[in-house]
Amino acid sequence: MILKELPKQRPNDFTKVLQDVEKIISYVKQKGDEALIELEEKFDKVKLTSIKFPEVDKLASQISQDLKMAIDVIFTQIYEFNNSIKPPNIIGGSANGIDYGIMWKSIERVGIYVPGGEKAYPSTLLMAGVPALVAGVKEIYVSSPPTKINSAIAYISLKLGVKEIYAIGGAQAIAAMAYGTQTVKKVDKIVGPGNIYVQAAKYLVSSDVGIDGIEGPTELVIIADETANPSNIILDLKAQAEHGRSTFLVLLSNSDKIINFVSKELDVDSNIYYVIKVNSIDEAIDIANEIAPEHLSLQISSAREYLPKVKNAGAVTLGNTPPAIIDYSAGPNHILPTNGWAKIRGGISVYDYLKMIMYASTSNPEKKLVEASKILAKYEGFVFHADSIGVRYE
């Protein structure tokens, strides 16, 4: 059905499963491997003989040549994109007698969750793993439901230098990587999408371990003018609808021709689409910035000119570029913020695996800095702060 008004709030409510997920996390913390084996049998209907996936090399060797080629090509593209935006190891300067700067250091141990669902998703492992490799992460661990670990997952894991693959899915996988078990290594950060149980688990463990964010259902906003190809618009919307019935799909257009054609063609579909007539492209940009979508597609004649006006979006495709290419081979990531989070953060990149360490050095700072520091420290009641500064430079 076609809707002509946007909802006030997008559905992404995992609060209804929080209590169940809390119990899972608590059980894993208490029982470790024993809990994982029991929970896998309960939820994934698999009786594990080993939590650590064996014979990765053997499984990787079974990959088909065409799939291997596709993975190699996409791996290289993602690597080159992230390497091109990787910052220098040290950035700094000086002022008023003080040398200062930042050092970029990689996170040491990362856990990547590769979701199950109807299919295995090797593209997610590429998107999460390659930026970690570029950043210099020394230990990468992967967890995925046991029935979804296939030759593609194994092959990519070898290319990434993954230390171990765990045959664990769902909230129990997140708990295991967050707190560690007899077999599963405790990591510093967990990255990767998943269902509401996985997202609830990431939310609950986020006070103890880093996470990439809370990813909700797929979102796409298309802004189209009269130059856009309506058939391509329909394909782009249907492509993102493949992610499930919870997807949030919006067309904003100032063209009656586009609006009418797309509405007619999509009306027979079971998914819900929002088709909105706007007065101008500027108005459409304003609406898109308020939505802050995961994917934004500017299918307009002057897309490059309008790109700087985009303030909030996970990823933007310009002109005739299909949004789906970012899901696979463009180089930027498909693990993107949803549900308005694009207002404050972006998609996964090399920066998600780097941390800043600030430094300062001085033997002779200008007197005004010394005096200012002492005055403010004493004002705040920190006398020894003031003395530790003053004794060195007076």
From Swiss-Prot:
Residue positions binding substrate: 218, 240, 243, 295, 327, 380, 385
PROSITE patterns: HISOL_DEHYDROGENASE (PS00611)
Catalytic reaction list: L-histidinol + 2 NAD(+) + H2O = L-histidine + 2 NADH + 3 H(+)
Residues at which NAD(+) binds: 113, 172, 195
Annotated GO CC locations: cytoplasm
Domain of life: Archaea
Active-site feature positions: 294 (proton acceptor), 295 (proton acceptor)
Pathway it works in: Amino-acid biosynthesis; L-histidine biosynthesis; L-histidine from 5-phospho-alpha-D-ribose 1-diphosphate: step 9/9
Cofactor note text: Binds 1 zinc ion per subunit.
Amino-acid biosynthesis recorded as keyword: yes
Cofactor annotation: Zn(2+)
Protein's GO biological process: L-histidine biosynthetic process
EC code(s) of this entry: 1.1.1.23
Keyword NAD assigned: yes
Residues binding Zn(2+), per UniProt: 240, 243, 327, 385
Keywords for this protein: Amino-acid biosynthesis, Histidine biosynthesis, Metal-binding, NAD, Oxidoreductase, Zinc
GO molecular function: histidinol dehydrogenase activity; NAD binding; zinc ion binding
First-tier enzyme category under EC: oxidoreductase
Family indicated by similarity: Belongs to the histidinol dehydrogenase family.
UniProt-listed HAMAP family: HisD
The protein's role, per its UniProt record: Catalyzes the sequential NAD-dependent oxidations of L-histidinol to L-histidinaldehyde and then to L-histidine.
Name by which UniProt lists this protein: Histidinol dehydrogenase
Gene from which the chain derives: hisD
